[in-house]
Amino acid sequence: MELINDFLNLTAPFFTFFGLCFFLPPFYFFKFLQSIFSTIFSENLYGKVVLITGASSGIGEQLAYEYACRGACLALTARRKNRLEEVAEIARELGSPNVVTVHADVSKPDDCRRIVDDTITHFGRLDHLVNNAGMTQISMFENIEDITRTKAVLDTNFWGSVYTTRAALPYLRQSNGKIVAMSSSAAWLTAPRMSFYNASKAALLSFFETMRIELGGDVHITIVTPGYIESELTQGKYFSGEGELIVNQDMRDVQVGPFPVASASGCAKSIVNGVCRKQRYVTEPSWFKVTYLWKVLCPELIEWGCRLLYMTGTGMSEDTALNKRIMDIPGVRSTLYPESIRTPEIKSD
């Protein structure tokens, strides 16, 4: 057994390199033809039933509007009931023929089953499940005194998607439907102070890649790995290490830094286009894909860059981080951040 592994240790890199040289050109030519075909024969969403979790703000809200513009029937769910009703009303005005709202918390298994049951009771079918609900927690790991308070991050970001997917899967099989899994580029581009958020998104990525193999062609899965998008995080809204909801745009500047923030509406349009074309992955903005190559080829460089941009000296305030100092340069914030996330009037509910 050891002899076989020793042989593979020597030969696998060599054969992989030359194998890729011959395999990649025809493979990407096939992918190119496939993309043309899928664009021409993109799915018509009119009358399709779409369930979106976390639909009260950010990408989830914009996904509701994008699906509505294409004539889909919507089941929208979130914890903030009043805000959810506002989104539903706008979706109706944009063209959705039927919208139902479900006030629920995806971190609770019973709520996830109820979300799906209410959708099926109302519409009788389910075509797309969009697992979008999520939350962000920002804190250095060593500063978290009670680790159990971080459980909510994984309960919402990871288990919420798992619970809802399990409940919806029989109906998605019947309709040969689609699942949208909202992971993040944070699954590989791991910024400090967000250890549990990063872990939840990495778990989500791995889980749905496994599900894709298990389900085969019965249910198509699109995994979304957005970069920095208009959202509550880029507005400066997050949970502390002790589970307290905080609005702090200075910390936002530290965590987002000099990375341009893309619009949530543009991101939603790219996601829906990708789902209708049966794309396996959607990354928005698309240039974030190159960060994965850097992670694979030069992981030490990524770690060094993160320490340089995000971290501070021992005992020093986060405001001294290089990210924050760059953002404090006049004109930088207005150039890189859309006006919607620069306003000081951010809701704290």
UniProtKB/Swiss-Prot annotation:
The active site of this protein is located at Y197
Please give the GO cellular component terms listed in this UniProt entry. Answer: lipid droplet; membrane
Q: Where does NADP(+) bind?
A: 54-80, 105, 197-201
Q: What happens when the gene is disrupted?
A: Semidwarf phenotype with reduced sensitivity to brassinosteroids (BRs) and enhanced sensitivity to abscisic acid (ABA) during germination.
* Cited NCBIfam families: PRK06181.1
The family classification in the record reads:
Belongs to the short-chain dehydrogenases/reductases (SDR) family.
Q: What does this protein do?
A: Catalyzes 11-beta, 17-beta-hydroxysteroid and reduces 17-beta-ketosteroids. Involved in regulating plant growth and development, probably promoting or mediating brassinosteroid effects. Plays a role during seed maturation.
Q: Write the protein's name.
A: 11-beta-hydroxysteroid dehydrogenase 1A
Q: Which organism was this protein described from?
A: Arabidopsis thaliana (Mouse-ear cress)
Question: Which lineage is the organism of this entry classified under, starting from the top rank?
Answer: Eukaryota, Viridiplantae, Streptophyta, Embryophyta, Tracheophyta
